[in-house]
Amino acid sequence: MTQEAMSVPLGCDGMRCFSGHEIAGRRSSTCRSGFVFPTPWVLDSYKRGHFFRAVYEANCYAVRANLEAIKADSESPLYVCGGQTASDFYNGILADVCGRQVITQKEREITGLGIAMGAFTGVGLYKDIREAAAEMSFAGKIYEPKHDCQAFYEDWLEKY
């Protein structure tokens, strides 16, 4: 899936995936859930990779919308874990769409790590969950937004 998505340019040649009529907090009166194509007669030119990349990009815009909704500090890095964050490709798009540094966790089984932190705190090995997290969690890879990609996604969002 990722390999196919990587072969498709930013913006998926005009294809978009929407999980609703909003993207990153911007409302569209013409768009509903599903895939949107720039013109119906170009459907034959789209391949599976276009659909895959469109989903990756849509998920990244959803994260951005959540950050904007909670008014997250735009200068602070975004710490991520779980599912899609195992993909370097996804994390790169996320950094570009959100315009901020994305930092993964070294431990991939983050749910188990969280349970261990809670258990160790509960039995008194750590005074609180913050201390457990400071001692037990470590940053993994760091992804920096690429200026040209970030500008592309920002421009697309403005046009939406």
Regions of interest found by a model, annotated:
Residues 61, 100, 118-126:
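Short, well-ordered loop/turn and helix-capping segments at boundaries between secondary-structure elements
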Residues 28, 67, 122-130:
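Short helix-capping/linker segments at secondary-structure and domain boundaries
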Residues 2-113:
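Activation-segment/catalytic-loop signature of the eukaryotic protein kinase fold
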Residues 124-160:
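Acidic, glycine/GT-rich loop-and beta-edge segments that sit at the periphery of enzyme/chaperone cores
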Residues 1, 103, 127-131:
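Acidic/polar loop patches that form or flank catalytic/metal-binding clefts of enzymes
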Residues 19-23, 37, 115, 131, ...:
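Generic structural "secondary-structure junction" signal
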